[in-house]
């Protein structure tokens, strides 16, 4: 149910967007090695062994692109808020661990999950991101004060002790084949010690929430979400073709009711497609990325080409250089808005990653009645 004069309201990934948070690149750091992070950085990556503050030049460039993105959204009458960056280049600790620095606040989608009138802070699964919610607290506090129906929730903070991670999971050169075997068996770097999830592993389809089980979200995390969202149906999915299964939004992207693009290298398994096929949803292979490799010092894969931001069921923001993805979405009947963001990818992801919904028009609907 949508409340009158609500500040916070968003039930899915495609209803008309009216209010959004866009991240900032200020002070972003490359985090030092830690158990979950080691498993995400490919052995041949130029990020191996590098950590510390990113250069002022790259930060300024990324911030300029994010500011330009904000201007484009505002010209379309979308209200934009920005996080308040804390000092990321400082040591942090809990009774269980110490970390050399934090990460940043470019990708709010990783941290904040908006479902209806509720904004939920995810547990997070990297130690360097444990305090990342603090960047968004000033905004959430403001929404809470202005909107009497808004709910601010925070999932139980995990300890992230060594028990949360498989020791030496990918510390040696194991090879891609072994990694793929492990992910197919759902054998990931994170254990089932306690509930873990990143908000970017969750896609909202009205009454149904689709959650990726992988490196950053475990089964206990999915169970916690199921208990928390009692009025929703929570479905766990996995993508066996992904050797680094982290965050669903460069793998499986809903565009509008009835249409999803799926990474052709990470196909949804046949048995998990039933929910979509039974309800007349079309899953099409996403277009190939325009690039053969990610930008320098970037965690993400070339498939950020799929990391698009849907503004309404007829309009989508696509990264400017991703011409094949833009062409495909154009042929699928969407108006495509090109956004230059590639030089900000390294700070936390693409157009979907760098945003978090505050308000979309529309109410809670059931898009999968047959199940």
Segments from the language model and where they lie:
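The feature marks the mature, well-folded catalytic cores of soluble enzymes
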Residues: 1-371
């Amino acid at each position: 149910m949508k409340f009158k004069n609500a500040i916070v309201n968003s039930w899915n990934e495609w209803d008309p967007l009216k209010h959004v948070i866009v991240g900032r690149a200020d002070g972003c750091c490359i985090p030092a090695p830690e158990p979950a992070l080691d498993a995400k950085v490919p052995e041949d990556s130029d990020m191996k062994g590098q950590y510390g503050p990113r250069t002022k030049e790259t930060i300024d460039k990324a911030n300029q692109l994010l500011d330009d993105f904000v201007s484009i959204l505002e010209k379309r009458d979308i209200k934009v808020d920005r996080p308040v960056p804390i000092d990321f280049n400082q040591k942090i600790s809990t009774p269980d661990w110490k970390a050399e620095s934090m990460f940043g606040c470019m990708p709010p989608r990783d941290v904040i999950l908006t479902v209806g009138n509720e904004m939920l802070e995810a547990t997070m699964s990297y130690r360097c991101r444990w305090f990342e919610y603090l960047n968004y607290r000033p905004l959430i506090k403001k929404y809470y004060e202005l909107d009497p129906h808004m709910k601010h929730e925070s999932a139980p903070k995990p300890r992230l002790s060594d028990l949360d991670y498989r020791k030496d999971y990918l510390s040696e050169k194991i090879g891609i084949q072994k990694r793929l075997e492990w992910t197919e068996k759902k054998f990931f770097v994170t254990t089932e010690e306690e509930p873990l999830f990143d908000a970017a592993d969750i896609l909202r389809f009205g009454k149904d929430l689709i959650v990726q089980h992988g490196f950053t979200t475990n089964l206990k995390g999915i169970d916690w979400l199921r208990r928390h969202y009692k009025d929703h149906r929570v479905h766990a999915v996995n993508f066996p073709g992904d050797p680094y299964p982290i965050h669903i939004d460069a793998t499986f992207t809903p565009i509008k009711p009835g249409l999803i693009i799926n990474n052709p290298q990470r196909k949804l398994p046949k048995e998990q497609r039933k929910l979509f096929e039974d309800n007349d949803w079309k899953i099409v292979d996403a277009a190939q990325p325009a690039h053969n490799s990610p930008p320098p010092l970037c965690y993400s894969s070339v498939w950020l080409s799929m990391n698009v931001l849907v503004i309404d069921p007829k309009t989508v923001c696509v990264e400017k250089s991703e011409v094949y993805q833009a062409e495909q979405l154009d042929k699928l009947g969407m108006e495509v808005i090109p956004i230059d963001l590639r030089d900000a990818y390294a700070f936390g992801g693409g157009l979907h990653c760098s945003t978090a919904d505050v308000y979309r028009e529309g109410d809670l609907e059931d898009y999968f009645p047959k199940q």
